[in-house]
Every structure is written in structure tokens, then in C-alpha cells.
Amino acid sequence: EKYEGVLSCDEEGRNALDAIFPVESSHFGTLPESGYFYSEFYHCFYNEGSSKEDAVAFLPKYTAEVYANSDGFDGTSFHFGNYFAQQNEDGSHTEEGIDFLWASFTNSEASMVQTNEVFESNMRSILFPQFTEFATCRDDVTDIYHGWTFYNSEQKDFMPDFSSY
């Protein structure tokens, strides 16, 4: 109640998710001081007989390829994460049966284009066959966000700066 005037969320759209972020957000460069970040989210589903354990086991393989191609990621603030759905009854992802969200974050849209090009040219042929053994993601829906950090526990007085966007 203390902060209900600051930020409120609709109850029906909230989702219970566990998340794993294998790469630190500052590993490939810092995010802008404004708090801005660009992100792409993919809706993913386990293949029959597969589970969260398979998805979690894949993350070190993907992470290793990211680090092996670090020249292509430098300066982009690239990091990624998987949000694993707990299938809460009122969550917005329940209707679609989404098992997990694959999320990529960068410091700009141009940086995302760059990292996607690195993936397509250097990583896809290695990783995609392994990924499709346990999951598929919708290719017709990519949630794109121009986001801002609203709270930084290490900088209590942090305020996002929307002036340049």
C-alpha cells in the first residue's frame, strides 16, 4: 500500500516465473546511465517428454558460445535469461501454455541487431539443433520492449531519464 501510487500492476496479468540469467548485464558493456535497455522475448514450449531441466542444462552450452564469440557482443551490454513459467492460474502466459520465455537484453536496438547477426552467422548452426531437441519457440511472436530500470538497489536515488527517448 505504501507504494501503490508509484507502480501498480493488474492482478490478472501477473505471472509467477523463476528466472536464470547466466551472463552479467555488465559483462559486454554497461547499460546507459538513463536506465534504458532494449529487449526481445520469445514464447517457448517444451517438446513432449522435455522439461525445465532440459532447458536449464542447455544454458551453459549457449553461454559458452556467447563467450566464444565475445568480439561480436562487446559494447552491446548483451545478456540473456530464461523465465520459467509456474503456470499460475491467472497469469497471462497460462492462456497460451507458454513454458518459458527466452529473453535477450542490450543497450540499444542497433546492438540487438548486431548480436542477432552474430548468433545467425556464428552460433545458430551449432546451438539450434541442440535447442530443438527439447523446445520450440514461436517465430511469429517476439515481444519487443524499450525498457527502463526503475529501481537500482545499489543506487537508492536512481531515477530513469526518458528525455532522450
Language-model region placement:
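Short S/T/G/P-rich N-terminal loop/turn motif that feeds into the first structured element of a domain
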Residues: 1-128, 133-165
